[in-house]
Each structure stands twice: as structure tokens, then as C-alpha cells.
Amino acid sequence: MKMADAKQKRNEQLKRWIGSETDLEPPVVKRQKTKVKFDDGAVFLAACSSGDTDEVLKLLHRGADINYANVDGLTALHQACIDDNVDMVKFLVENGANINQPDNEGWIPLHAAASCGYLDIAEFLIGQGAHVGAVNSEGDTPLDIAEEEAMEELLQNEVNRQGVDIEAARKEEERIMLRDARQWLNSGHINDVRHAKSGGTALHVAAAKGYTEVLKLLIQAGYDVNIKDYDGWTPLHAAAHWGKEEACRILVDNLCDMEMVNKVGQTAFDVADEDILGYLEELQKKQNLLHSEKRDKKSPLIESTANMDNNQSQKTFKNKETLIIEPEKNASRIESLEQEKVDEEEEGKKDESSCSSEEDEEDDSESEAETDKTKPLASVTNANTSSTQAAPVAVTTPTVSSGQATPTSPIKKFPTTATKISPKEEERKDESPATWRLGLRKTGSYGALAEITASKEGQKEKDTAGVTRSASSPRLSSSLDNKEKEKDSKGTRLAYVAPTIPRRLASTSDIEEKENRDSSSLRTSSSYTRRKWEDDLKKNSSVNEGSTYHKSCSFGRRQDDLISSSVPSTTSTPTVTSAAGLQKSLLSSTSTTTKITTGSSSAGTQSSTSNRLWAEDSTEKEKDSVPTAVTIPVAPTVVNAAASTTTLTTTTAGTVSSTTEVRERRRSYLTPVRDEESESQRKARSRQARQSRRSTQGVTLTDLQEAEKTIGRSRSTRTREQENEEKEKEEKEKQDKEKQEEKKESETSREDEYKQKYSRTYDETYQRYRPVSTSSSTTPSSSLSTMSSSLYASSQLNRPNSLVGITSAYSRGITKENEREGEKREEEKEGEDKSQPKSIRERRRPREKRRSTGVSFWTQDSDENEQEQQSDTEEGSNKKETQTDSISRYETSSTSAGDRYDSLLGRSGSYSYLEERKPYSSRLEKDDSTDFKKLYEQILAENEKLKAQLHDTNMELTDLKLQLEKATQRQERFADRSLLEMEKRERRALERRISEMEEELKMLPDLKADNQRLKDENGALIRVISKLSK
């Protein structure tokens, strides 16, 4: 039973075995070795790139093509040039490689060597006859591609030696195509040969490269406008892909099929450059109109004999027209090219002067296109379109291109077009916001125009030139103004507000623009302004209620002087209204304890808008003429005089005005606000700009650096000053009481005390950059000292962008003696000023050394000297030192507040203030002895010298920029080389990996043999088992 069961199982196993996969395997294994066969050319290129000359020679003997090119058109010689393999280059050239063979982009080996900067290869190739005037597909010669100076020099010398005309070389292809097209047209037979790889025709090349003359001639000769290359591309595909608008227009005018697709189903719209998609859509609409008109013409079934005759005559006329216009083309082709150059130059100029936004330009170009459409089209039309002129489209014969202008089409002038259309629409083509903003570049304005002035000016500008200037943008030069007027005559008005550029610290663009404005506009000189002021002083020796003073808009200097001179009493509570610097008036003048004659009061400080705009040629003058609002806090009565509003706030004793609010208000008139920067950033920027701003006329670089150092020191000491602030105030109160008692003794001692207090308050103000309002009693001395400090702070903030100071050259001689005295008095004053931090005194000295005008720093003894000098002058003695002092004092007190904006130059305001309070008669006596002409000549000479230095500095800066650019370019090239080295290393690593893989592949047959042996053994075992089972 057991044996029967075993046999049955074995039989079942055998049944399963028969027909199984293993049983179906043949008993003898077929061993077919599959080999990868490479193209001979690919093997040759690989051998060349590896540098194996023996292998290359074997392949050449076997019949390999030495000029074999890969898919990119690169030959072995190209690759050797790129790899910097000089030996292989020489080997290939010696073995007959074509030295001028181009790749798919038209690059010959010399292009590759020039691009990589391999001098030795380039020299060898040139020596072997490489063509230095060879042009690639983009019209670049090896000289254009060369980056390193040595390579450029080598190629340029070779071009000069061979006498190659580069421009002629660029146009060589177009010239040859024109010649062939004319031959085909004259012979009536087209002998074109398609490109071997792409199947492209002459029409494809002319369309892709924008050879419009060739394109017209080929179409005229009877070329099919819808001809396809091997990829199914039509000439319209090529023209659209390469963005050639004129070529697209010519093809569409000749009724090419715009819906044709290439082999991958793309229309011309799918492959078109983004820039001309809209233009293609417009052309399609135009073509649809033409087709519908043709259908309308063909609708009559019966044609009269007259129409037939017309058609016959039209055909003959077409032939005649061809004969007539053909020589015109030959003769005037050069003219057309010159005309195109002129057009491009005009476009460049228009780009510079363009100040409108892109939307405005579109509207502008559309309106122009409409006017152009209404002009009669003097082109010769076919019989089909001769009767329908109502539509603004004309179909021309193939000879004459349509004069139709569309909103986005830049149209060059061709000699065959009958209508002449201005290419103004091309402005938009290369235009970016950077280019059109250059037209109205905004200089860093240091004082914004008043709202009133800006609105009036804006209205005036709109009425005249159609351009709205921003408050700080310079007037355009006369040439730009003329262009704007020309635009207006065409019926276009362009509104533009210059972009708000943050204030910059004397950047090169500012300097250049200011120099331009200096040359294009006449300026009112400083001596003129001062003499005008001097005349006014003589006229107004008594109190003059309604007097107005003209002042040059280039120096915004009268603000503090006018305010200080119009304080008639020591206990007054003045409120100064400043309608953005256009109106200043003192509203209240209460009890008078000391009667001092002043030059003006109330309305005497008004300066009308017309006077403000007195020297309106220069925008810089406009800017400087607008002083910042002045804030005068007086002990019990705090007055915040912000722009255009007068605020009178009565507070109790001890109220301190909000200095932060004052500063906010003041800054709002100093810096034009940018939309994208936050309020805190804007404040910080404007404060920094005010502190270290320099003028274009009188500040030297050393002055600016010293000023910045001073500001740096003041910031470090600011925290300490705040800690000592309360102590200072207590000290001041005590001193105020003492001065009140001393005041009763004599006027002279009281004035001395004023000066002590004034100079101290002055220094504190300088340290804190904001007005200090004392909360003490309402004594005259406290109110005056507080007012003077606030005036000083406002003059700091109102630093105008004008002549920074009279020259440092002549002022140093005047002030040297006084400086020495000031340093001695510093030590004596230590006992008095113990409450003040040491940093104040330390900072006072460098400021004193930076003075630009002849006003000495105030000390008690020097003030006594001044009083002695003044009395000497009144008696009639004219000592030299007294004269110079009176000159400098007079300039300080009379020119205007801007002369004392010297927060950077460290001048004492108490000096000029007290000088204002003295009678006019004594000052006028001193004024008579001054020689303003000599001073003016000195200033002028110094300014010229500084301008020359500035110009030299600018030149050096531009040179440095050029060197920097060259250096960065070199670094980029070095980076490219390192990248190339990395690629080489990667390639070597990959080659090693390939060789390892090949070794493993060699082991593969052994493994297969082992596998087969095991299979055979398995089959044998199975057979043995099956026999045993039986």
C-alpha cells in the first residue's frame, strides 16, 4: 500500500513537471553576446577629448571625419579650445581640421578661445589663418566676446593689421542674401537650398534675423510665405520666436496663415516672444479685416467688362511698379539704415527726457496712432482694396509696405513706404522706471517747499509745461523743457510727480545735478544779498512797521535774525508764526523794561511769496528759501509755532513744552516722506541728514568729518547729560535769581550775565538737539535765555543747503587771537560751571576751532573787549582788529539766520543777538568801514577752488568705480574658471566610475556561466529523482 501511494505521488509530480517553465528550457544554452556600438564620430570626439593622439590617428586612418560635429555643432577643435588643450589643438590643425568651422550658434574655434581667454590658443589659431572678422548668429565677432584686456588687445591689433571692417562683417550675411534675392527676382527663378539639418529656407533666415529688405524681395520673387522647415516651422514662427515685429507685419500683410502649427502642434502665438504677443493679436485682427473685405469684394457673381479691364491695367501697373521701385531700393538702402540710426538716437533722447508713467505713454501712443490713421495713406493698393478706404487699414502691393501704425508697433522708416510714421512708440520698448525717472531726478532736498508755494508752483507748471514738479525736484534744463513743449504741441499732457528719494549725504548724483543747475541758471551772489540787506538797514534806522526785505532764495538765513531783532523787550512773550517760512510775525509785546531800538517789529519780518520766488531759476534756491518752523517756548507761556498755524498755549509755571512733538512737527517740513519707510526710520534718517549734511558751495571734506566726529561725541555724552539735567535746572534758577538782583545795579553787568546764561543754554541745546524750556519764574533773563535756546535749536534744525560759511581761510586769521583768549577763559569758568558735565566744555573747543566766519566764541572777557571796541568805533578810531570784528559781527547779525545755522561750526548765537539789540547807529558806523567787494572776491575765489576740488574728486570717484567694476568682472571670470575645474574633476571621477562598472561588466559572463551550470545540475537532479520515483 505504501509503495502504491509513493508511485502515485511521483506520477503527479511528473505531470506537473511536463510543460513547466524549467522543462521548456532548451538543453543547449544559446550564448549571444550583445555589444554597444557607438558612432565612429562619437568615438573620435571621445578620443580627442581624452587627449589620446595615438587612438585619434588610428581612427583617422580608419576613415573618421576630423570635422565631425556633435548635436550642438561642436567639432573636436572646438572642444580642444574650450578645454585649453593646446597640444590637441595643434595636432588637429596639423591633421587638416577646418579652422573656421562654425557650430550651431555660428561660433568658430577662435570665438571659443577668445571667450575663455586662452591667449596661446588664440595666437596659434590666428597664425594658422583663423578669421578674426567671423560673426556668430548674434552678430558678435571674437573681439566682441573677448573679456580680458590682453585678449582684446591681441584681437584688435590683428583686426587693424588685416584691415577688417567689423561693421561690414556684421552685415555680410544680409548683403549676400540681398544680392541673391535680387538675382532670383530678376531671373524669376528661386535657386534656394534648404539647410541640411533644420530644413530652413532663406525666408526663414530673413524672418528670424529681421532682414526686412530681403524678406520683401523674397516674397516679391514668389516665395511661399507659409513654407515649412523640417520641424514644421513657418517664417512667421521664426519671426515671432525671435521678436521681429517688422518681419511679422510684412508676413501678415502678405496674408500668411497665422494658424499654421508645427510638428508639435504649436502656432506662431505659442512660440512667440512675450513682448510681441499683443502685437501679433492686433495683426491677426487686421488680417481678419482684410479677409472679410476680400470676401465682400468677391461676392458679386457677374463682373462687368470695365472691371476686367481695370484688373488687366492693374496687373501691368504692378509690373511697372516693380521695375520702378527696385532701383530705388538699391539706391536708398544706405539712407534707410542711416535713418534708422537717427531714429534710435532720437529714441535715446526721448528715453532720457521721458517723465511719464507707462500708462500715460500707452495713451499717448494710441492717440498718435489714431492721428496717423487719419492721415491719407499714399500707398498703391490692389484693385481689391481700391474702393474701400473707409476702414483704417490699407493692403498694399507686395512692393510697398503698409504705412499702418498700431499702438504697440515700433515702425522704422523704409525708403519704399509712402507714409512717414514717427517711431515715437519705441520709447516703451526699452523703458524701465529707472530710465524715465532719470528725466526728473530728485535731488536730496534740505528744506521742503511750503504748501502754498507748492500748490501755486504746481498750478503754474501744469498750465505751462504740463509737468507737475514735486516740491524738491529741480527744474528741467532748457532742452528738456523744449521737448516737453513739443510733446504738448502734439496734444499730450504728461503729469508726473518725481519719486521721493531719501536725503543723501552729498552723493555723486546730487553733486552732478547741482553742477548742472549751476551752469544752466543764474545765481544771486552773496555780496548782492548782503548789500541789499545793508541798504535796507540804512533805510530803516527807525522802527519801520510795514517794511519787507527781499532776500536771495539761495541763502535761507534770515529766520533767527529777524526773530531775534524783533524782540523789543526782555519780558515779551513772542509767538512766531511761520507759514512754512513765508510769514513771520510777533504777536504780543507786553511791558518794556529796557528800551532798545530794533530794526523791525510785527509785520517787518514778512517776506511775501513773490519775494520768496525771486530767484526761481534755481530750484536749490527755492529749497533753501523755506526755513523750518520756529518754536519759542517762554517760561509761563509756551508757544509752538508750527507751519501755517499759530498756537498760543498758556500754561502754569513749571510746564515744559513737548520737545518730541516740536521735533516731529519740525521734521515734517524737512524731509519728503517716502511711502515705504516707517515713521521712526524717516525720523532717524532726517535727523542724521540734518546733523551731517553738507552744502555744495562752501563745506570742505575736513569740515564734514570734524562735524561727524563732534556728533559722535555728543551722542556718547547724551546719557550723562540727561542725568545731570535736573541739577542744571536748579543751578540755572539760582543764577537767574542772582542775575535779577544784579540787574538793578547796572545794565552792563546785566548784559554780561545774559551772555553767561545764554552761552550755557546754547551749549546744552547743542548737546540735546532740542529746545530746553525752563520752568523757573517769569524773569526777563529766564525768558530771554529760554527763547534764545529754542531759536538756536531751530536754526540747527533749519540748516539750509547753501553757502556753509564764509571761507575758513580768512576767518582763521581773524579768530586766532580770540580762540586763545577763549581757551584761557575756559579754565576760569570751571568754578562757575561745575554743574555742567565736562563733555560740554570739551566739545565746545573743537566746535570753536571749526568756525568758518570771523565771529569769536563768546567768553566774559572777550565780551568786555567787544564793548571797548564798540566804544572805540563810535569815537572814531579805526583799529584793524576792531574793523574785522565788526565785519564778522555785522555779517552774522545782518545776512540772515542761515549764517548761524552753524551747529556744525560752533558759533555763539548770543553774540549776534546782543549785537541786534544795540542801536542801529553804532552798527551802521561800523558797516561803513567794511569792504564787501573784497570779501566777496575772496569768497568767490575760495568757492571756485572748492568747486575745482569737488570736480577732481568726482573724476577720481568715477575712475575708482570703473576699476571696481573691472575687478568684479575679473573675479567673476575666476569663479567661472574654478567652476570649469570642478566640472573637469567631476568628469574624471565619473570616468573612473565608468571604468569600475566596466570591470564589473567583464565579470558578468562568468556569473552567467555559473548560473547556467547550476541550472543544468538542477535539471540533472530532477531527472534522477524522476527516475528513482518510477
Curated annotation (Swiss-Prot):
Residues 357-369, 861-875 have a biased composition (Acidic residues). Heterotetramerization is mediated by the interaction between a coiled-coil of PRKG1 and the leucine/isoleucine zipper of PPP1R12A/MBS, the myosin-binding subunit of the myosin phosphatase. The KVKF motif mediates interaction with PPP1CB. Its main location: cytoplasm. It is found in: Cytoplasm; Cytoplasm, Cytoskeleton, Stress fiber. Expressed in striated muscles, specifically in type 2a fibers (at protein level). It comes from Homo sapiens. Residues 302-316, 540-551, 796-810, 884-897 have a biased composition (Polar residues). It holds the Pfam family Ank_2. GO terms for cellular component: A band; actin cytoskeleton; centrosome; contractile muscle fiber; cytoplasm; cytosol; focal adhesion; kinetochore. GO terms for molecular function: 14-3-3 protein binding; enzyme inhibitor activity; myosin phosphatase regulator activity; phosphatase regulator activity; protein kinase binding. A motif (KVKF motif) lies at residues 35-38. Key regulator of protein phosphatase 1C (PPP1C). Mediates binding to myosin. As part of the PPP1C complex, involved in dephosphorylation of PLK1. Capable of inhibiting HIF1AN-dependent suppression of HIF1A activity. Keywords: ANK repeat, Cytoplasm, Cytoskeleton, Disease variant, Hydroxylation, Phosphoprotein, Repeat. Gene3D superfamilies: 6.10.140.390, 6.10.250.1820, Ankyrin repeat-containing domain (1.25.40.20). The lineage of its organism: Eukaryota, Metazoa, Chordata, Craniata, Vertebrata. Residues 290-628, 643-928 are annotated as: Disordered. This is Protein phosphatase 1 regulatory subunit 12A. Changing residue 1014 to A: Loss of binding to PRKG1.
